[in-house]
């Protein structure tokens, strides 16, 4: 509000009272004069020295004007024939002061981090010689003001200037300094755009002005005589301007502000490039540095895309949609689309301001330039922002392959990839990016310490950027004065930079810059520059002298020196070698104290194979050598490579270290020579010519680049070669992702097909077509194969695993423009540029053509490679054709035409015909067809009727080259103009798209990855972006994605007989299926020809034979009708606010009768077939999704003969609500964990466990005397009602089981006298039940028409209780007459100040019948229960309040912001009498604590001084307000427990979880002792180090853990720290084990690779790939040696998901590891038995040495005992269910087996007995027996149960 006084404008001279000179100052010749033109007093400033004649506003530089207006208006007139200077100092939001100066003294634009200097072009009288000259010239007009200079109104958009040129946010105007020579009338700041042509009088008569334009205030306007025009007398300049006289970086006169009545003002007009350079249309539209390079076109334009920031540490490229605090919205008129501005910014993200809307209205104007329309301010931004994050780039080079640099540590290499600079870590392959260049990077250079990096981009407007390399920030950017920079060289100190390039006439130019101030102020000055006729290939600054340089090129080697601002050179006398073409040079490395710094050898290489040694000090040619002839290469001659005098091999690059020299030659060899060049001691052959070599700083590795796009490192000591990056050498045309493997296939104009590993970016395979270009490619959805279409019309089918051509089809004659597989892979579709389309049958052994149609597809090769589109169900095929104006939809099974749509006539208002360019089906039904058109539109067509359902306009400036839709159809991707855009399709027209840059060429294709976690775009390179949008919960909940094809799960993919069973079911996205899969109907859909749209007439339905679609439509209709149905149910009882529900005694007996009566009652219940909408409240209980189910039968142990007893349970269910009970008087304390109630003694820590619930317990209720506990859970199967169990707290017996609610119980409460008990069902159940605690008979029920979140009894009136729900509180009254019970309810809405959308989520009474209710908005309402009115509200939190407790004059609140607060509410009773006039200031907060999760349960003593609080993090806290302390009582995992292990000595155990935590617990107290947390990773497996031979010692105990990023971390328990981090795997580590000696770690990965690693050194000793392709599930070692085996050593085994077990014998001290045996187990052939959740389990049998115990997914449910000695199965133990976990006791012949049916089975193999134990609400996925065999630990999701084994 501080800036309100500045609205609408501030007259600065009047504000400072300039005439008094008290708040301002003047210096020199400053006088006030009367101006005849303006007829008012103005100030004249004149003098030959501007710095000595000026007006300063305010008086001193330490003061600030503090004016926040966006626009600065300066009314001035330059004095004829003179120069003037104006300085404007502004402050940015980060506190940085920036000076903006403009003057006709400046010759060119200059920019530093703190100073912008703009040349000013003075206007002249119309028709004068100056005006004529200005119109004809394009540059050189900066200079003294002409004699006819006029009064000028200069409008500076300070906010935009600061944002555009320096990427800073404008804060306020600090000062202004007006220097001679000029006349100035005034300065004004405002947030409004004023039109100087119009004054208030004219505006009042005109009544209307263009949107966003205001008339000039009276005191600022210029007088205009009658009959004259304002622009004939004065100049109006708006900067940034729309002028075309000079380049963008000068201030000059442009067009008038308003070009036509009613036409809005252009905000940021287009700018043209100098016309001396001819450029193509794509180049014109490039995203330019500080520059929009677009030319006006007579067509509507969209809003300006403005880049807000370029990352200084470029980890991601993002499109941030911030409104930028008035940058886009406040008082802004309209914007002309001029492209995207890119510039340096000190942030970590690249942000772009996007469209204000998806579509814009078209307005006809009378001007000859495009007009941009205003955008609605209500447009929202797309969230998350940014939605993309650039993660990886596959590519190298682009403009040049001659630059790749080492960092000074040798850990990373830096190389260009088109317009992006990539920093690649050699060991890990991780990439980070330096972003900012808008064209291809042509040169790179480091200073000596690698702290500064210089980079140049190609093009006629070449730019050089200086980077702070560690931060990734751009320190400076500047023009190079050359057409294109070809080479850069930094001095060792980093203070001098040299560049070589060509000027506009093609002449070589050398420029030397002073960069010493770049790090401080960002200023770079030209030291010297020179033109020369000689050719320069390489130029380097001598590392020992910043003023000396050496260059080489064709016919010359020259020495250069900078002295006195001039650059001079002299040639080296080369004698007979002066005609050679020299390619590279290098100085002798190292420094010898006895020699001068310049006394060293200069090595120069040539294209003829010569290497010259030049004495640099004496400028003398010392020696000449030559590489051996090309025909005597290493492949043909094995003798030593030497120099000779014969014809040589062209040397492209040279690098010299202190001990050897490296050369890269045209024959593809990297050769290493000693410095005497006696012979090659190491060489590496490449696929193409080596273009660059660089020796690492330590001299042990050599970096090499090839012109074929390969970047690699040669390790000299080990003679190993590591390929870092491969790349296509031409434009990418198409790509395809494999649905199930992390593989990407790409095709390019370089005639190659390449397959990449998307995890490591390594090239796996490549195929080369010599005489034809691959045009389109697609992966087979099931097999490891792909199809590729070529320019000749041939389609080839490649088998990847066999790396062979499997089939070839030659049905087409034109280039292939479209190629697709059906979702099940049984069919293939193709089309070509000559108009034909073909359908193929794809079998495992044979492929044949089913049908070919000619002249049906549009004959245009430009539509490839995405000319075809197939619906996700495989039923509809669409393409553009037979003309470019039509789109055809066919039956994908038969190619029968179903529909043809003419897209050219859909827009009736358009004067041009629209052509269809590309298309795509939306994945979800009704499978809308998206069509991109030449009119920059995306059309959404109904695939049945062809009707236009939606339209998105102004998608891109040029054509949309590719589009894709996410699996949930919420997001749409489009590519065009080198940009990517992301659109939210759920709210079209109201959410701005996000825009992403980075590509330097047109984007050929963009698509989502199969798992929807990434987006891939291809053009100049392959960009892999992280897609950060959260999955749509509605999409994951509904069955929108059918099941995975059977062939993906097992060997059925190889079975030809299974082909006929396949359908076109789409491949799963990896998200869990919400409902059971429906059968897929293979018959084609009938075309609905009804002209009526279903959405317009919901009572009309079209016929469909697709049951799934029909059911899906019915789901949507019934979901919307559920609230109305519930309303009718309630309204039918009584049409008033009081509902009376009567309940007869016999009805109560019926409800509490036998189970058969309950079932018969259940059949008669009125229930909706579809669930109501889920409440948007964390307070409401939602049971966790479980894929497991309850077992049908159990083997219960005989009483007293149980082999297991439950000792302890680790964890608390943070998913429950009010599921903890504590009575401070009796000390009774209980909580729930899964389906178990834990009763714990707070003094001793001992636990009792009450079992019986079949499902997760949702809530608890304790009577006031703490003698009875009620608990509620689901039923466990859909056929029965959920359970409410009544427990006796004294002996733990279950007294009663109540069944009434259908789904879950949300809340329960006992009355104050414990006589009544009320239970509330969840949102699906919608029932309230009132029970009598005497026998627990049902007294009354009520149907609730809205969900209820909380219920509680009034302590003052035993017959009253209240409930809270959405928007209202309900007061209930119980009335009893004899045996009849009635309940009445009065429902009161929340006050208006709380909001109608607020939900009441918690309630509590005080002792005087005041009811406190907490809201989802964080407010607390206080209600008078007698009058049923709310008399007080206050904001108690920023989040939803889920817990309320009131004791006396204190109130406790707990919310989902993780905070609990204690309030003093003593004054509330007094405020009760004041009614609505009560003030919330009388409520005071006394204490506040922040815990580790949202608050879900709380119980306190009567004084609210101490209590226990439960959170969603699975923690129970002891809270003491008096001492202000919180102590963790109970801890547990919030997410799934991934692994557990017991330490030697059995005093501790360790668990790890999905959240990346590794926790160590005490097995005595079950307390959490230690926790190691790794962010953003999952900890998947762990292992304790083995017990040392000296005996147990806690000091030596370590834990090794494997993580999802492929790393292993070793933690010391005693030191409580991480000792080592190892990265042996490229993907997740799924299994880990120590060898029995502890010398090595054995780990298995998700890719099936196994690594043997030393835990002492961290080195990976060996990698085993025998299980490659199937994740490792088990690794186990045994120290027992067997006499019957052929080999000695330690035995260990590994099992993988493909039902294979390998057994190994190893002697690690001898580096010996041999495969001993290989076991493979069959799987069922029936598809209905397929269960991919069953793991492969294997273990060594402790009591039978040499025996392996196996269980897995097989033909039978069983455990197998396999003898390694006898090579046969010894024993089979049948199981009732497949095992999901398995462990064997080392002390007895016991096997513990967990299953997905929530059972733990203990099998005594010696006695042949088995016992089942049920204490789980989910599958038992982990079982571990302690080393002594006394304890058994099991895990079910996040619960850990500790059992005692009765070995007797």
UniProtKB/Swiss-Prot annotation:
InterPro entries: Beta-prop_EML_1st (IPR055439), Beta-prop_WDR90_POC16_2nd (IPR055441), CFA20_dom (IPR007714), Quinoprotein_ADH-like_sf (IPR011047), WD40/YVTN_repeat-like_dom_sf (IPR015943), WD40_repeat_dom_sf (IPR036322), WD40_rpt (IPR001680), WD_repeat_EMAP (IPR050630). GO terms for molecular function: microtubule binding. Residues 1-222 are annotated as: Binds with microtubules. Disulfide bonds: none annotated. GO terms for biological process: centriole elongation; cilium assembly. SUPFAM superfamilies: Quinoprotein alcohol dehydrogenase-like, WD40 repeat-like. Residues 257-278, 316-336, 1053-1133, 1151-1178 are annotated as: Disordered. It holds the Pfam family Beta-prop_EML. Residues 320-335, 1114-1129, 1164-1178 have a biased composition (Basic and acidic residues). Keywords: Cilium biogenesis/degradation, Cytoplasm, Cytoskeleton, Microtubule, Repeat, WD repeat. It is found in: Cytoplasm, Cytoskeleton, Microtubule organizing center, Centrosome, Centriole; Cytoplasm, Cytoskeleton, Microtubule organizing center, Centrosome, Centriolar satellite. Residues 1102-1113 have a biased composition (Acidic residues). WD repeats lie at residues 436-479, 481-523, 530-570, 644-683, 685-724, 727-766, 769-808, 811-850, 955-993, 998-1035, 1252-1297, 1300-1341, 1343-1382, 1395-1433, 1435-1473, 1532-1571, 1574-1621, 1624-1663, 1670-1714, 1774-1813, 1815-1848. One of its GO terms (cellular component) is cytoplasm. Belongs to the WD repeat WDR90/POC16 family. Microtubule-binding protein that plays a crucial role in ensuring inner core protein localization within the centriole core, as well as in maintaining the microtubule wall integrity and the overall centriole roundness and stability. Required for efficient primary cilium formation. This is WD repeat-containing protein 90. It comes from Xenopus tropicalis. The lineage of its organism: Eukaryota, Metazoa, Chordata, Craniata, Vertebrata. The gene is wdr90.
